[in-house]
Swiss-Prot record:
Keywords: ATP-binding, Cytoplasm, Ligase, Magnesium, Manganese, Metal-binding, Nucleotide-binding. Disulfide bonds: none annotated. It catalyses: citrate + L-glutamate + ATP = beta-citrylglutamate + ADP + phosphate + H(+); N-acetyl-L-aspartate + L-glutamate + ATP = N-acetyl-L-aspartyl-L-glutamate + ADP + phosphate + H(+). GO terms for molecular function: ATP binding; citrate-L-glutamate ligase activity; metal ion binding; N-acetyl-L-aspartate-L-glutamate ligase activity. Residues 325-361 are annotated as: Disordered. Mg(2+) 2 binds at E277, N279. Its EC number is 6.3.1.17, 6.3.2.41. This is Beta-citrylglutamate synthase B. Mg(2+) 1 binds at D264, E277. Its main location: cytoplasm. Mn(2+) 1 binds at D264, E277. It comes from Mus musculus. Its cofactor is Mg(2+); Mn(2+). GO terms for cellular component: cytoplasm.
Length: 387
């Protein structure tokens, strides 16, 4: 911890995911930022916390220690597929009620926990969404087969709590859907969604931090399946995005109330987009590699900027420079499906490959010259300040 502390910032996560890449990277970045900015920092695991109401006031203990000075900002990373309102959200509500600024806030996390809840929030705001049906109760899947037929086959079927492309099916017809009803697990309801054929096996992952698009990645399936998730073997490459696509991603993040959000956009033949999903606990191992970014560092800078002193750190101020320059230097995404796929086959490699591998180095050298290395840009700016 550094001296002359000017603020207090915590990193709160769950024991089940704290050793995963995003959490380890965010922890690294927050420690570095807090030392650089002379901030008081603490990393906390959810199950170490005891919430109290004593003499009519909210309180907090961590591993038996009574906490007397609370953080001004808490960076939250919880496993959204398993978030429970009676435990995880209770902890986040407690901190929020005590005056802590959470990123993301509990309501924003809830808006993204359930895929249909996400669509409920976005509906009525002019956001392009695939037609989608769902139901109440856990045993009504079979009853929905006739109701959802108006969406036409093939149709997309998803568990509302699924993640990383799991529990997602493309139902060919009613018979196939009936067969699925006997095989699926019913812990959470499913949704039935209109199939966007032209985006089969392809989507655009957009990461938004603090209302700014920090990067975009085109993801493509390598085995013909509908899902393009890198965790399922898909490949990704940095891409530019049209202004319409960027504004759509920002609009979605704003409506959902997220500080950090991963938004997946489906592509149509006319170059427009519709929203597939939003993730408040977005992973970025593939994103960092494909886009040559340090997303954790951007998150840490934004967290520091939320402290009462109101400092906008240098990295966050440079994001607008990068965004503006990339708009003038990069070709926009939005060509017909075949063109994007051809580009992918010529320029991408598996994002799960060794970062030092020849294939990935070749991929990076083939990227358009106008694409930016955020870390290099920052290093150059800092060098100018020192000199």
């Amino acid at each position: 911890m550094c001296s002359s502390v000017t603020g207090k910032l915590w990193f709160l996560t769950d024991r089940r995911i704290r050793e995963d890449y995003p959490q380890k990277e965010i922890l690294r970045a927050l420690k570095a930022k807090c030392c650089e900015e002379e901030l008081d920092f603490r990393a906390v695991v959810m199950d170490e916390m005891v919430l109290t109401v004593e003499q009519g006031n909210l309180g907090l203990r961590i591993s038996g220690e009574l906490i007397s000075a609370y953080p001004q900002v808490v960076v939250v990373r919880v496993p959204t597929p398993w978030v429970q309102s009676d435990s995880d959200i209770t902890v986040l509500r407690h901190l929020e009620k005590m005056g802590c600024r959470l990123m993301n806030r509990p309501q924003a996390i809830l808006n993204c926990v359930n895929k249909f809840w996400t669509f409920q929030e976005l509906a009525g705001h002019g956001v392009p969404l695939p037609d989608t049906f769902s139901y109440g109760g856990h045993e009504n899947f079979a009853k929905m087969i006739d109701e959802a037929e108006v969406l036409e086959f093939p149709m997309v079927v998803k568990n509302t709590r699924g993640h990383r492309g799991k529990a997602v099916f493309l139902a060919r017809d009613k018979h196939h859907l009936a067969d699925l009803s006997h095989l699926i697990r019913h812990e959470a309801p499913y949704l039935f969604q209109k199939y966007i054929k032209e985006s089969h096996g392809r989507d655009v992952r957009v990461i938004v931090v603090g209302g700014r698009v920090v990067g975009t990645m085109l993801r493509c399936s390598t085995d013909g399946r509908m899902q393009s998730n890198c965790s399922l073997g898909g490949v990704g490459m940095m891409c530019s995005l049209s202004e319409q696509g960027k504004q759509l991603a920002i609009q979605v993040s704003n409506i959902l109330g997220t500080d950090v959000c991963g938004i997946d956009l489906l592509m149509k033949d006319d170059g427009s987009f519709c929203v597939c999903e939003a993730n408040a606990n977005v992973g970025f191992i593939a994103f960092d590699k494909a886009c040559n970014l340090d997303v954790a560092g951007i998150i840490a800078d934004y967290a520091a900027s939320l402290l009462p002193a109101g400092r906008l750190t240098r990295r966050m101020s440079l994001l607008s420079v990068v965004s503006t320059a990339s708009e003038t230097s990069e070709p926009e995404l939005g060509p017909p499906a075949s063109a994007a796929v051809d580009n992918m086959s010529a320029s991408s490699s598996s994002v799960d490959s060794d970062p030092e591998s020849t294939t990935e180095r070749e991929m990076l050298t083939k990227l358009p010259g106008g694409l930016f290395n955020m870390n290099q840009l920052l290093a150059n700016e800092i060098k100018l300040l020192v000199e």
